[in-house]
Amino acid sequence: MSYSTSQIRNVALAGHPGAGKTTLFEALLHAGGALQTAGSIERGSTVSDFDPIEKERGHSLDAAIASTDHLASSGQQIHLNLIDTPGYPDFRGPALGALAAVETVAIVVDADIGIAHGTRRMLEYAKQ
């Protein structure tokens, strides 16, 4: 299916390590129908953490992109390009590259720890 630019949204998920970016990525893809079942970090079955080292360590090393469709409240079909970004500072390069490619950054905050240092850093980068 082809989409007009007005129907496309490019969204990066960013935040502190372990905040839930990959889990949200999986849930959004599942809700949009792109995945039959949302993957799990614990099971090593996520779409975005496909590298064996990512599965072993339980966190993202690189940014990953996947797409799904969403019916907006206006009735317009929206095509979402979602980018799951790594949270650890050692892998911040791919996250910053993703921020440059999107018009929207969703900052994911861990409800247990609140706004952490990595959250603040990514928020500042997103503002640039």
Language-model features and meaning:
Residues 114-128:
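Amphipathic helical hotspot of TIR/SEFIR-family domains
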Residues 1-96, 100-101, 105-109, 113-115:
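P-loop NTPase switch module centered on the Walker A-proximal segment
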